[in-house]
């Protein structure tokens, strides 16, 4: 399987990639290659977008949908993030946080 970055026209063979992670700055997807090198592959506007792009790549790898995965653009990720349901906030003990209003 290959991953492709439209903006830079970079293509990487996943057989040459040891790991994929959010870069140091927090707004990029970086690749750790089997040769020991690290390459910044794609830059995004936020860490949340970078994490979502990695999640999309992981889903594609898991399902084995295609031979080439094109890294999503920021606009596509923003739409996907906005459509996600809000997470329910729970206290560290696992209980819901108590609301202090209403009747």
Language-model segment annotations:
Residues 1-103:
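Eukaryotic intrinsically disordered, low-complexity regulatory linkers and tails enriched in Ser/Thr/Pro
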């Amino acid at each position: 399987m290959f991953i492709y970055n439209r903006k830079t026209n970079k293509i990487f063979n996943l057989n040459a990639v040891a790991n994929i992670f959010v870069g140091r700055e927090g707004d990029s997807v970086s690749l750790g290659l089997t040769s020991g090198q690290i390459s910044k592959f794609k830059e995004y506007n936020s860490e949340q977008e970078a994490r979502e792009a990695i999640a999309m790549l992981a889903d594609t790898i898991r399902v084995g949908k295609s031979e080439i995965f094109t890294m999503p653009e920021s606009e596509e990720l923003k739409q996907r993030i906005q459509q996600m349901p809000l997470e329910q906030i729970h206290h560290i003990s696992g209980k819901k946080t108590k609301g202090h209003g209403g009747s």
